[in-house]
Amino acid sequence: MEKFEGYSEKLKFPRQYFVYPLLFQEYIYVFAHDYGLNGSELVEIIGSNNKKFSSLLVKRLMIRMYQQNFWINLVNHPNQDRLLDYNNFFYSEFYSQILSEGFAIVVEIPFSLREQSCPEEKEIPKFQNLRSIHSIFPFLEDKFLHLHYLAHIEIPYPIHLDILLQLLQYRIQDVPSLHLLRFFLNYYSNWNSFITSMKSIFILKKENKRLFRFLYNSYVSEYEFFLLFLRKQSSCLRLTSSGTFLERIIFSRKMEHFGLMYPAFFRKTIWFVMDPLMHYVRYQGKAILASKGTLLLKKKWKCYLVRLWQYSFSFWTQPQRIHLNQLENSCFDFLGYFSSVPINSLLVRNQMLENSFLIDTQMKKFDTKVPVTPLIGSLAKAQFCTGSGHPISKPIWTDLSDWDILDRFGRICRNLFHYYSGSSKKKTLYRLKYILRLSCARTLARKHKSTVRAFMQWLGSVFLEEFFTEEEQVFSLMFAKTTYFSFRGSHSERIWYLDILRINDLVNPLN
């Protein structure tokens, strides 16, 4: 325990003071608004027809914040269904949104300063690249071919509000900011937002995603901090005694020599004593822990993780959230893909003089497939088809222009093909394209009060062009003037596109 506390003090964030007066500056909220517009997800105000940013309303909020009764109402009436004593639903939602966005901007400042002031400046870009979503699939494709066991982890949720505040209290000393954060959490938990009753922690309210992401990332970073400590303590490379380390190497060499003499008896024991090769990958609420160790070692890690959540976060999690499987015989879903590492047999005919014989070679391949049923379920949820995959019209889009309808359907289709470009089998994507294409035709026919057949004949090739700009054409346009690419047989080629910054509900149905 003393060793852990010393490690914790060395690697954790230093305590920071939040710049609390920034909450009273108008430019903070303007900056938060501009950040939302330039980001991948637009921040919308629920209940308002005009979704433009209003500097006048921000100035009114600043005036009310300087009044003494404003903060008294927040403390004495934190469980009100409306904010700031306003009867108007628009004012309540607008002020709630800009306060949470501005607060999220302020609380992120100490964490950004820590990354900039890190003494190991040369290692920062490498660390960020490893944590990027862009590197996940190439990493899995390169490393998982040499591993044996896989632990598929579902990070437990929801976490109690007080635990979230305690995690932040370790790093900050600004009491007013913590009180304001407590108010936001109590206010939105009463609205059944992301912490208390949502099925998934990532289905956040649109107007407060930035703040909730910050809180969730704080929780996950704390959990991974403990996991990193356990990983380093389990490695023999962390031993401080050089004599013990040399003895471990000599003992391992003796075991290898003994294993050559008695291979049947010693094959499974050798990897339990030697330092296991472990890899950890996480995105959103799912994580993968893979290694070359034995099944007994993986069961011990499962016990460590369950007790970690129980004693460090006061959170009881079911052991069923951690699935242990042999990598060669299991299929796991991650980032919207069904992935596996099957063993394929390859027969090679060898000719030596007058004799010929066949060599059976076993090869591993990282296989990724498109999940058909969940994707059709997502399309049905978005009202593009029925639950069985039969295309239907989209009545809510009939008020749009023909070009906007074509553009929306075409964009969804291109995004699906773009994201699943790394799939080893793409026949499923053509079924999704058929659903979207016929749904688009039914929507246009319903708008113009015509039949689908007549409308498709009238549109002709213009209608088809919106649905045939696939990944091969996009990729060839990017390199048209520099390099020639032949995309014949592209159904067997895999190209991982690295510009996917987020995954919407249609391409991430499994989480």
UniProtKB/Swiss-Prot annotation:
Organism: Oryza sativa subsp. indica (Rice)
GO biological process, one term: mRNA processing
Record's GO cellular component terms: chloroplast; plastid
This protein's record includes keyword Transcription: no
UniProt protein name: Maturase K
Single annotated GO MF: RNA binding
HAMAP family from the UniProt entry: MatK
Similarity annotation: Belongs to the intron maturase 2 family. MatK subfamily.
UniProt KW keywords: Chloroplast, mRNA processing, Plastid, RNA-binding, tRNA processing
UniProt subcellular location: Plastid, Chloroplast
InterPro entries named among the record's database cross-references: Domain_X, Maturase_MatK, Maturase_MatK_N
Described function: Usually encoded in the trnK tRNA gene intron. Probably assists in splicing its own and other chloroplast group II introns.
